[in-house]
């Protein structure tokens, strides 16, 4: 089975919002990604609306349903609603995405940079996971590869984990990948042993994706945004998505 590519279109919205108006068109960019072979679209609507907004979520939900590809909504389940942001649970109830990825990021974070700590009180998180699953979506939790209790995600009711791959990307850029890959491979094995599906994302790129997938068993899906959109500035969006799909086809699940 081919590992799935979900393209994160947040950066398209960042560019649009920097100028105001509707260009570049997030919906058209997503359409291009799907036509080029992307298996899904990811968004991370934040309470400060710095990129993806509630209206984008609704429109992209309709688009992905029309094209029969998966919609993945990321977000902090603890962030309260505020003006323009109805809250993650309400957005998911309105759109019923195939997957909801819960991320423990604060309002002031530039980007997601750590996973959940299952050593903390997780009663509220378990209740929220149950609420998100009641929407009809599978639930994935953002985790660090070094988390000693990745199996705790299964105990909380999650279906998958998304391995935070930022540390791997940094190690790859410095040419020091062996230790990082061993850590992620171990995390993948522990997740699989707990019955969890494995996703991966953050700073994955054409340069480092193949090595990661060759070393980490059982990855089902990668979510890629920043690097893909950056590369598309030089290579074109359609060609860039196709290049990622080619990498994934060469890295079959279970291969």
From Swiss-Prot:
GO molecular function: pyridoxine 5'-phosphate synthase activity
Catalytic activity annotation: 3-amino-2-oxopropyl phosphate + 1-deoxy-D-xylulose 5-phosphate = pyridoxine 5'-phosphate + phosphate + 2 H2O + H(+)
Top-level taxon in the UniProt lineage: Bacteria
Keywords: Cytoplasm, Pyridoxine biosynthesis, Transferase
Enzyme Commission identifier(s): 2.6.99.2
Location, primary (coarse class): cytoplasm
InterPro entries: Aldolase_TIM (IPR013785), PyrdxlP_synth_PdxJ (IPR004569), Pyridoxine-5'_phos_synth (IPR036130)
Pathway: Cofactor biosynthesis; pyridoxine 5'-phosphate biosynthesis; pyridoxine 5'-phosphate from D-erythrose 4-phosphate: step 5/5
Membrane spanning residue stretches: none
Subcellular location: Cytoplasm
Broad class of enzyme this protein falls into: transferase
Sequence similarity: Belongs to the PNP synthase family.
Xref: PANTHER family: PYRIDOXINE 5'-PHOSPHATE SYNTHASE
Summary of subunit composition and partner proteins: Homooctamer; tetramer of dimers.
Protein name per its UniProtKB record: Pyridoxine 5'-phosphate synthase
Native organism: Xanthomonas oryzae pv. oryzae (strain MAFF 311018)
Encoding gene (name): pdxJ
């Amino acid at each position: 089975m081919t590992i799935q590519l979900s393209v994160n279109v947040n950066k398209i919205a960042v560019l649009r919002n920097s100028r105001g108006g509707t260009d570049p068109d997030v919906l058209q960019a997503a359409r291009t990604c799907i036509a080029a072979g992307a298996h899904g679209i990811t968004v991370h609507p934040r309470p400060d609306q710095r990129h993806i907004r509630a209206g984008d979520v609704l429109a992209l939900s309709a688009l992905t349903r029309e094209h029969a590809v998966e919609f993945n909504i990321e977000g902090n389940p603890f962030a309260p609603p505020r003006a323009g942001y109805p809250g993650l649970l309400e957005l998911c109830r309105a759109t019923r995405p195939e997957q909801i990825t819960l991320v423990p990021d604060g309002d002031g974070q530039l980007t997601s940079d750590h996973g959940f700590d299952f050593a903390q009180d997780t009663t509220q998180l378990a209740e929220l996971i149950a609420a998100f699953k009641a929407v009809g979506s599978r639930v994935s939790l953002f985790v660090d590869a070094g988390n000693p209790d990745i199996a705790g995600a299964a105990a909380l009711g999650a279906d998958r984990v998304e391995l935070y791959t930022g540390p791997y990307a940094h190690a790859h850029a410095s040419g020091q990948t062996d230790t990082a890959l061993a850590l992620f491979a171990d995390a993948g094995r522990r997740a699989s042993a707990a019955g969890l599906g494995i996703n991966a994302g953050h700073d994955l790129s054409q340069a480092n994706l193949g090595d990661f997938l060759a070393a980490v068993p059982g990855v089902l899906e990668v979510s890629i945004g920043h690097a893909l959109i950056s590369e598309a500035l030089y290579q074109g969006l359609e060609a860039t998505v196709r290049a990622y799909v080619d990498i994934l086809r060469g890295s079959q699940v279970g291969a």
